[in-house]
């Protein structure tokens, strides 16, 4: 099945502690999760690694969100939207379901 949410898509979070926030997808994981820039920030405790020159301490980073909890953001309607697939000129393309515009 083709991915409805892909890397560099602008998405909006539908559920969870980051509900309503928008961001760009930085990574799509194979287990059905996505990492969104600036969303679902966690604080991780890291040990120092002197051999690599890494300092220890508290590090803030983005955690993965299930793909069902995000929706693609449609800039024309300024709302979350659903994605459909269709063939145009022999190529499979994604489009917004609300206004039939190609993504």
Curated annotation (Swiss-Prot):
Keyword terms: Ribonucleoprotein, Ribosomal protein, RNA-binding, rRNA-binding
SUPFAM superfamilies: Translation proteins SH3-like domain
InterPro entries, alphabetized: KOW, Rib_uL2_dom2, Ribosomal_uL24, Ribosomal_uL24_CS, Ribosomal_uL24_KOW, Translation_prot_SH3-like_sf
Keyword Transcription regulation: no
A GO BP entry: translation
UniProt-listed Gene3D superfamilies: 2.30.30.30
GO cellular component, one term: ribosome
GO function terms (MF aspect): rRNA binding; structural constituent of ribosome
PANTHER family: MITOCHONDRIAL RIBOSOMAL PROTEIN L24
Complexes and interactors: Part of the 50S ribosomal subunit.
Sequence similarity: Belongs to the universal ribosomal protein uL24 family.
Entries under NCBIfam families matching the protein: rplX_bact
Functional note: One of two assembly initiator proteins, it binds directly to the 5'-end of the 23S rRNA, where it nucleates assembly of the 50S subunit. One of the proteins that surrounds the polypeptide exit tunnel on the outside of the subunit.
The name this protein goes by in its record: Large ribosomal subunit protein uL24
Organism: Pasteurella multocida (strain Pm70)
């Amino acid at each position: 099945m083709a991915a409805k949410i892909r890397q560099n898509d602008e998405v909006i979070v539908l559920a969870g502690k980051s509900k309503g926030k928008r961001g760009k997808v930085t990574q799509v994981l194979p287990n059905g999760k996505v990492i969104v820039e600036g969303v679902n920030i966690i604080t991780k405790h890291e040990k120092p690694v002197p051999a690599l020159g890494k300092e220890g301490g508290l590090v803030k980073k983005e955690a993965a969100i299930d793909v069902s909890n995000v929706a693609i953001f449609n800039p024309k309607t300024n709302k979350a939207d659903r994605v459909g697939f269709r063939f145009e000129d022999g190529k499979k393309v994604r489009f917004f379901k609300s206004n039939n515009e190609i993504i």
